Amino acid sequence: MKKLLVFLRDYKKESVLAPLFKLLEASFELFVPLVMAKIIDVGIGTGDNSYVLKMCGVLILLAFIGLTCAITAQYFAAKAAVGFATKLRHALFEHIQKLSFDELDRVGTSTLITRMTSDINQVQSGVNMVLRLFLRSPFIVFGAMVMAFTIDVKAALIFVVTIPALSVVVFGIMYVSIPLFKKVQSGLDEVLSLTRENLEGSRGIRAFRKEQEETAQFEQKNGLLTGMQLHVGKISALMNPLTYIIINFAIVALIWQGGLRVNVGAITQGEVVALVNYMSQILVELVKLANLIVTVNKSVACGNRIAQVLEMESSMEDGTLEIGENFSEQEMQGKKSVVSFEDVAMCYQAVSYTHLRAHETSQDL
């Protein structure tokens, strides 16, 4: 997958600006709970309606700036991802044209089509999401923890316990699911290859009455693919419930601890609401991070499959004789161009034979 990053070389500016604007959006988002705390403690607590309206205007301003940054970041991320996929698709298509029939048959036409279409689309989605969320989500998670410490240290210790527990769940599921996604893609290639063979050879299958055998073989391959997809889907599906359980327990503990701190006058009610909002922000970002991890897992698996084709060397070699270098145009005038084969040996995988004798030309084939 790392070898494919060379196709992002022409989009360095977009690859930097997209995460930068996402970080700006996240920074403004982290100030929202503090503004809410001021509205509750100062505006509502003292009955100052003008202060409430003024701070509501601040919230609208923060939302507008955040929206502008998000749209700008999405533009740069989409431009980089689409440009990356376009260059990768062109490079892959050009490389496939250089492969001999031996390599094409060894890899398989169906899997090449899959890598040209769905695999590249999956990698494009992965690049887009990485540029938008790879820095934003961790920034908000740890930024929310830092902002919680600025409010109250004892209550913020709940964040210190919650974030590592969530990290274990998220990265543990990622560690298990990455190899399974690779197996799913391999199973998809087998099903596509079998489907293509059945469609191209449908007349032969009917002529030899092999419909039942081919149907049974397809059901077997499709069943294996379905089983692998269900297995990896069940593992990935554990992400949301486990993270929600941890976050909800953390919110309960936060409200309980916050209530005790309010009774002793250490913090205010608005600050408790701000702490809960920060915990909710962590929940939302971890859900996004979970979806990002699933997408990145698929993208890495697809990227490795594309890289395998790009690393494949062709057994064909172009000739070095060219008119104008080895032969002058004057020498070629008045002469009939004839392609001749003398003592030519041909081979195809394990089959080889010598057929053409000396002085035979392509017209004798």
Region roles according to the model:
Residues 354-361:
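Conserved small/polar residues in nucleotide/adenosyl-binding loops
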Residues 200, 279-350:
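ABC transporter TMD-NBD coupling linker
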Residues 48-52, 147-161, 231-304, 309-310:
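Helix-loop-helix
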